[in-house]
């Protein structure tokens, strides 16, 4: 048996893939199996009872995880003048205007989150085909089109996670690292789930949270009882 096959066999050992585990138990199992040589990201995936092809069933938002994500989030900001200086002071990794536009248009996308002041949106909007599919387009609904660029940068650096439902009705996100304690991961997942629940669209009918699973970067998905992800 090869090394990869052996590793997968060990990861899958003692997991009942037909069972719905309590959140805390599932997180513990994922952590125990996160044995890669790097600090694996813990991820949550939620299947929702929505059809995002309909405008009244779109789910999107932003949540501030209480224990952060554990990763270094690179932030790009479209701004000029004083706002550009505010962004730099707040810790933005890339700040610019036309120069940043040209860089992105040329294929240089070295950031995880993009923020813009309102006056920059006519320029940024021209990058829709590049930023949109990567979920990087600034949007006022999630606080990334704003005059308060300093706080937006700090929020992005401090654990803000943007989410958006995909075509199949799935929303997912990295919510911590394998090095986090179980309780911290559980707290982050409950905060994320709470934000998704609050973002339930009026057009959603029937069961909203259908399935939940947690996994690590190199691990397998473990099914979670949806009732256990809700905040008490």
UniProtKB/Swiss-Prot annotation:
GO cellular component: cytosolic large ribosomal subunit
GO molecular function, one term: rRNA binding
Superkingdom of this protein's organism: Bacteria
GO BP, one annotated term: translation
Pfam families recorded: Ribosomal_L1
SUPFAM superfamilies (alphabetical): Ribosomal protein L1
Keywords for the protein's UniProt record, in alphabetical order: Repressor, Ribonucleoprotein, Ribosomal protein, RNA-binding, rRNA-binding, Translation regulation, tRNA-binding
Entry-linked InterPro entries: Ribosom_uL1_bac-type (IPR005878), Ribosomal_uL1 (IPR002143), Ribosomal_uL1-like (IPR023674), Ribosomal_uL1/biogenesis (IPR028364), Ribosomal_uL1_3-a/b-sand (IPR016095), Ribosomal_uL1_CS (IPR023673)
Task of the protein: Binds directly to 23S rRNA. The L1 stalk is quite mobile in the ribosome, and is involved in E site tRNA release. Protein L1 is also a translational repressor protein, it controls the translation of the L11 operon by binding to its mRNA.
HAMAP family registered for this protein in UniProt: Ribosomal_uL1_B (MF_01318_B)
Family: Belongs to the universal ribosomal protein uL1 family.
Quaternary structure and interacting proteins, as annotated: Part of the 50S ribosomal subunit.
This protein's name: Large ribosomal subunit protein uL1
Source species of the chain: Bartonella henselae (strain ATCC 49882 / DSM 28221 / CCUG 30454 / Houston 1) (Rochalimaea henselae)
Designated gene of the protein: rplA
């Amino acid at each position: 048996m090869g090394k990869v096959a052996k590793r997968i066999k060990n990861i899958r050992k003692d997991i009942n893939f037909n069972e719905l585990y309590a959140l805390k138990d599932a997180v513990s199992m994922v952590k125990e199996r996160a044995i890669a040589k790097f600090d694996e990201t813990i991820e949550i995936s939620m299947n929702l009872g929505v059809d995002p092809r309909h405008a009244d069933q779109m789910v999107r938002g932003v949540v501030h995880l209480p224990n952060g994500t554990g990763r270094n989030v690179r932030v790009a900001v479209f701004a000029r003048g004083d706002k550009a200086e505010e962004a730099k002071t707040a810790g933005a990794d890339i700040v610019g205007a036309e120069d940043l536009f040209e860089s992105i248009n040329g294929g240089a996308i070295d950031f995880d989150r993009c923020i813009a002041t309102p006056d920059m949106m006519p320029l940024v909007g021209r990058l829709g085909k590049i930023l949109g599919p990567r979920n990087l387009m600034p949007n006022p609904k999630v606080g990334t089109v704003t005059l308060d660029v300093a706080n937006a940068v700090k929020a992005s650096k401090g654990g803000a996670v943007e989410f958006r439902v995909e075509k199949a009705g799935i929303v997912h996100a990295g919510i911590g690292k394998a090095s986090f304690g179980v309780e911290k991961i559980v707290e982050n997942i409950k905060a994320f789930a709470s934000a998704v629940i609050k973002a339930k669209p009026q057009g959603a009918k029937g069961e909203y949270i259908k399935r939940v699973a947690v996994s690590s970067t190199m691990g397998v998905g473990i099914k979670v009882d949806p009732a256990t992800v809700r905040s008490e």
